[in-house]
Amino acid sequence: SVGFKAGVKDYKLTYYTPDYETKDTDILAAFRVTPQPGVPPEEAGAAVAAESSTGTWTTVWTXXXTSLDRYKGRCYHIEPVAGEENQYIAYVAXXLDLFEEGSVTNMFTSIVGNVFGFKALRALRLEDLRIPPDYVKTFQGPPHGIQVERDKLNKYGRPLLGCTIKPKLGLSAKNYGRAVYECLRGGLDFTKDDENVNSQPFMRWRDRFLFCAEAIYKAQAETGEIKGHYLNATAGTCEEMIKRAVFARELGVPIVMHDYLTGGFTANTSLAHYCRDNGLLLHIHRAMHAVIDRQKNHGIHFRVLAKALRMSGGDHIHSGTVVGKLEGEREITLGFVDLLRDDFIEKDRSRGIYFTQDWVSLPGVLPVASGGIHVWHMPALTEIFGDDSVLQFGGGTLGHPWGNAPGXVANRVALEACVQARNEGRDLAREGNEIIRKACKWSPELAAACEVWKEIKFEFEAMDTL
C-alpha cells in the first residue's frame, strides 16, 4: 500500500536522523531532554524535532502535499548528560525556511512554542542555539553597538559606571531627578530607572523624563563629561512605548531603557529600530528572566535569551555579576558575555557554549554587572569583565554614609585605581584589596565606603589559570 496510511506512528521513524549532515544555513538547537520513564531518548528527541517543525501527532493528508524532507526538523545527535540519570542532550536541526526573517518572536514560537508541554517529556530545557549567518543577516541587531557607544559618550579604556536609583518606587519626580544629579555629579556615567518604574501614580513618566533630563544637563555642565540616565520607556502598549522614546529624543538625552522579556520581543525590536533611526542608545533589563532560566532541567538557558536580545536589539543587557559565586558559574557567565560582545565565538562545552557562533559583524552588546556589588568588588569586576562592560552599583552608591554624590565618587575612584593598576601590569586577582586600600589614602569618600562594606574575600583565582 503505497498510498496514505492513517494512524499514529513513532516520531523517531521520521524525525530521528543520526546520519544527517548539518547545513551552514540550519538553525541548530541543543535541548536538555528528560524523558518520562519508559520513553526511549531517540523518541523524545525526535518528538522535540517534530513538534518544533512539521510534526503533528497523527499522519495527515496534507503531509502528502508538503516536501517533508525539506522542511522537517531533524534530531541528528543524542548524548547522555554526564552525572545525570535519564537526561540527554538532543541536537535538533531546523531548516532556515521554517523561520520568518528578522523575527525573534517567530523563531521562539517555532523552536520552543509548543513542545515544552509535551507529555512524553518530564522536562525540557533549551541550552543553546546556533544562529546561522544567513539568518543573523536578516536582523538589525543592537541600535549602535559598543564602539559607536564609546564614540557617542567619549569614554574609552575603562568599564562604564552606573547606578539604579533606589528606593525603586515611591520617590516624586523632583526628588528622583535630584538623586540622578547627585550620582552623575559625583562621577558615574549613567544612572538607571528601576525595571518596574514605568508610569505610576506617584511619578508619571513625563515628569520623570523632564527632571532626569535637567539632572543630566546640569551634571554634564559641571563635570565636562557626557552623562546619561536610562529612561525606562517600557509601557502597556507598543504605541505608548514609542511615544516615550520620542519624548526622550526630543529632550536630547542619550539613552532609553526597555524590559525586553516582559515587554516582549516584538516591542523590543520596534524600539531598537526606532533607537537606531534616532540616535538613542538602548539599555535592556532582563526582568522575568529567572522565571524562564533558573531551573537546571526545564526552561531556556539565559545564553539563548542573550543571543535573542543581540538579534532583537539592545546596547546594554544585564548579565549577572559572577563575583562571589561558584567558579563554574563564572565560566558560564563569561561564555554568554563573550556571545554578547564578540564577533565569533568557538564552541566550548566547559563554558556552556554548545555551538560555534558567527555573528558576521552584528554590533555587540555591553554586559551589565548589577546587583549586590560594592567598591571592594571593583578589582574582581575589572578583571572578569574587562573594559567593555557597565558596572552598576545601586545600594553600593546610594548606601554611602555621606550621601549619593560621595557614593559615586567612591566608585569612580575605585574604578580608576583598578584600571590604572591593571594597565601598570599589576595582578588584580591577588592585589585587589591592597589597590583599593591604597586609593583610600587620597579619597576620603572611598575610605568611608570601604569602612561600611568591609573587605570581602575574593573567591577567585587569576584569569590566566584557566
Curated annotation (Swiss-Prot):
Q: Which residues carry this modification: N6-carboxylysine?
A: K192
Q: State the reactions this protein catalyses.
A: 2 (2R)-3-phosphoglycerate + 2 H(+) = D-ribulose 1,5-bisphosphate + CO2 + H2O; D-ribulose 1,5-bisphosphate + O2 = 2-phosphoglycolate + (2R)-3-phosphoglycerate + 2 H(+)
What is its biological role?
Answer: RuBisCO catalyzes two reactions: the carboxylation of D-ribulose 1,5-bisphosphate, the primary event in carbon dioxide fixation, as well as the oxidative fragmentation of the pentose substrate in the photorespiration process. Both reactions occur simultaneously and in competition at the same active site.
The cofactor binding remark recorded in the entry reads: Binds 1 Mg(2+) ion per subunit.
PTM annotation, UniProt: The disulfide bond which can form in the large chain dimeric partners within the hexadecamer appears to be associated with oxidative stress and protein turnover.
The record's listing under PROSITE patterns reads: RUBISCO_LARGE (PS00157)
Q: Which residues bind substrate?
A: N114, T164, K168, R286, H318, S370
Please provide, alphabetically and separated by semicolons, the GO molecular function terms listed in this UniProt record.
magnesium ion binding; monooxygenase activity; ribulose-bisphosphate carboxylase activity
Query: At which residues is there a site annotated Transition state stabilizer?
Result: K325
- Kindly provide the name given to this protein in its UniProt entry: Ribulose bisphosphate carboxylase large chain
* Cofactors, names only: Mg(2+)
| Localisation per UniProt entry | Plastid, Chloroplast
